[in-house]
A protein has these predicted regions:
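NAD(P)+-binding Rossmann beta1-loop-alpha1 motif at the extreme N-terminus of oxidoreductases
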Residues: 2-65
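Phosphate-coordination loops involved in phosphoryl transfer and adenosine-cofactor binding
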Residues: 24-27, 96, 137
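Hydrophobic Val/Ile/Leu positions in short beta-strands of Rossmann-like dinucleotide-binding domains
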Residues: 30-31, 75, 142
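Rossmann-like NAD(P)-binding element
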Residues: 64-92
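Glycine-rich, N-terminal phosphate-binding loop of Rossmann-like dinucleotide-binding domains
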Residues: 76-78, 103, 144
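ADP-ribose/adenylate-binding Rossmann-like module
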Residues: 93-108
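Rossmann-fold dinucleotide-binding core
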Residues: 106-109, 113-177
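An accessory alpha-helical subdomain
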Residues: 169-309
Length: 310
């Protein structure tokens, strides 16, 4: 509850102190702009004074106008259609048009944009769902492709609204998303399916639960409040994700077999191995590595450090 309250205060404050400063209005077309994430970007960019047009599947007869005159085109369609849409849209774009996608997979889309469009290219991945009200306190991963300066105004806008830009290569992004998204979704998906299968009285369980259990149930509820197509597509998006989920399932089975055998010694050893991995020393090092990595790639896109006022 307190986390939601604090985040809500941050978002409200951001909307006051980060009112869009004057910017040159740009012509933007969002392919898939009536989808949930497409609507979010449409609302944010329109509120900032830009001219936003939408191209849906039934609008391709107008593509020459909607795409040919655009300064920025954002591809916001399901993962399985992204590359095909990039290929189709690119034939209408001017060489100076900036092209980006906002799907949760980056290697293939960025490669496709570089192959089919000679102009500015960047992959973006908003690390939040479409239910948020603003970019405040949210992260967006940016994967540079070509002519990065053409996207500087967009990234600066996201930062001005309280967002944080994390710079990554497409390959690093996809590697990290195997864990951040795919296996995490599968783990919570599995627990949700198990609870439904067992017919657990969730309300009764919450009445006698710990704070961590209530938090986990809230996270699972939010997962199942999403589109089932989106959740499944995230898990199945790449072969690497499917293989990682299979390995996670193998780990579950191996640990479950130890429980079935009541092998206390082996379970304690597994716990201690993981405990060592999650030690303070191991967890702090990647953060420093990430900061150094970002310094080497487009450091101008990083947010300034804001003193902790709590």
């Amino acid at each position: 509850m307190w986390t939601n309250l604090v985040n809500g205060c941050h978002a409200a404050l951001s909307s006051v102190v980060s009112s869009p400063t004057y910017t040159t209005p740009r012509n933007i077309t969002i392919i898939g702009g009536r989808g949930r994430m497409g609507r979010f970007f449409t609302q944010q960019l329109t509120a900032a004074g830009h001219n936003v047009s939408i191209l849906e599947n039934e609008d391709w007869e107008y593509a020459d106008h909607l795409l040919g005159s655009a300064e920025l085109v954002i591809v916001s369609v399901p993962i399985k259609w992204t590359v095909d849409v990039i290929k189709r849209a690119s034939q209408y774009l001017a060489p100076t048009t900036a092209l980006c996608d906002i799907t949760s997979v980056k290697t293939e889309p960025v490669q496709a944009m570089l192959e089919y469009h000679p102009g500015p290219v960047m992959g973006l991945h908003p690390m939040f769902g479409p239910n948020v009200k603003s970019f405040a306190q949210e992260k967006v991963v940016a994967c540079p492709g070509r002519q990065d300066d053409s996207f500087e105004w967009l990234l600066d806008f996201i930062k001005s609204q309280g967002g944080e830009i994390i710079v990554s290569t497409p390959e690093e992004h996809d590697y990290m998303m195997v864990i951040i998204q795919a296996t995490r979704h599968f783990s919570r998906f599995s627990v949700g399916v198990f609870l439904a299968q067992e017919g657990i009285d969730i309300e009764r369980s919450l009445s006698m639960s710990s704070p961590s259990y209530r938090q986990e149930i809230d996270i699972i509820k939010r997962l199942f409040a999403q589109s089932p197509h989106l959740c499944v597509d995230i898990m199945l998006a790449t072969q690497d994700r499917c293989q990682a989920i299979a390995k996670l399932a193998d780990t579950y089975n191996r640990l479950a077999s130890l429980v079935a055998r009541k092998d206390r010694t082996a379970l304690i050893q597994e716990f201690e191995n993981a405990q060592s991995f999650f030690s303070e020393e191991n967890i702090s090092s990647p953060k420093l590595s990430q900061e150094n990595h970002a310094d080497r790639h487009l450091s101008r896109y990083r947010m300034p450090v804001v003193p902790n006022r709590s």
